[in-house]
Design a protein with these regions (language model features):
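Conserved helix-turn-beta segment of the N-terminal RecA-like "Helicase ATP-binding" lobe
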Residues: 131-168
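Conserved glycine(s) of the Walker
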Residues: 103
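Conserved helix-loop functional segments at active or binding sites
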Residues: 69, 81-88, 92, 114, ...
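Conserved pre-motif I regulatory segment
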Residues: 49-97
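Conserved SF1/SF2 helicase motif Ia
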Residues: 93, 107-136, 144-149
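Upstream accessory/linker segments immediately N-terminal to the RecA-like ATPase cores of bacterial MutS
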Residues: 1-66
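Conserved motor-coupling elements within RecA-like helicase/translocase cores
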Residues: 156-177, 184-189
């Protein structure tokens, strides 16, 4: 099954058999990418590509301070490690693992806020439109007082709205893009 067919059938299966095939295809892709990434990391090959130096901004510190809860020790450790990587100017490859509700998203919010305040655009890609919409709502709420422009881009976004969003991204009018695989289409510049 082709990748685009698998994406379609995972959301709108024509039959139970199509759903199973789509699920197997997407699981295979996920494991293949994971294994390839792990091989790159463990092979000791540094990426030759230069990254951007992005430091911790006062807004990120303020956001953490104003959360209605304290970050866990594991979250603080992961955040500090990733912030150090971002400040190094090297390309960062990280996998943040955790159960549902363990606090992975808040780390993404903080790191993407740092990117935006440093003058860069950032993207959060979610596996489903429902999750992308949830992230869009939570990011918008958490970052409302930081003058961050956030866009939602999914497969079901209407064509006119997509064109407008593509243009805003290209023109630098969007700081953070949240979406599904639609965010990695050729039209996104």
């Amino acid at each position: 099954m082709e990748y685009h067919q698998a994406i379609w059938n995972i959301h709108f299966p024509e039959s139970k058999e199509q759903l199973i095939k789509a699920k197997k295809r997407l699981i295979f892709d996920e494991f293949f990418i994971f294994i390839a990434a792990m091989h790159m990391i463990t092979s000791g090959e540094d990426l030759k590509e230069e990254g951007y130096k992005i430091g911790v901004c006062k807004e990120a510190k303020e956001l953490v301070k104003n959360l209605p809860y304290e970050l866990t020790t594991a979250q603080k450790r992961a955040l500090n490690e990733m912030a150090k990587d971002m400040a190094s100017g090297k390309v960062m490859n990280r996998l943040v693992q955790g159960d549902v509700g363990s606090g992975k998203t808040i780390l993404a919010v903080i790191l993407l806020l740092m990117c935006a305040k440093a003058g860069y655009q950032g993207v959060l890609m979610a596996p489903t439109e429902v999750l992308a919409a949830q992230h869009y709502e939570s990011f918008t709420e958490l970052l409302e007082s930081y003058d961050i422009k956030i866009a939602l881009l999914t497969g079901s976004t209407k064509a006119k709205e997509k064109r407008e969003t593509y243009q805003k991204i290209k023109d630098g009018e969007v700081d953070i893009v949240i979406g599904t695989h639609a965010v990695i289409q050729d039209k996104v510049e």
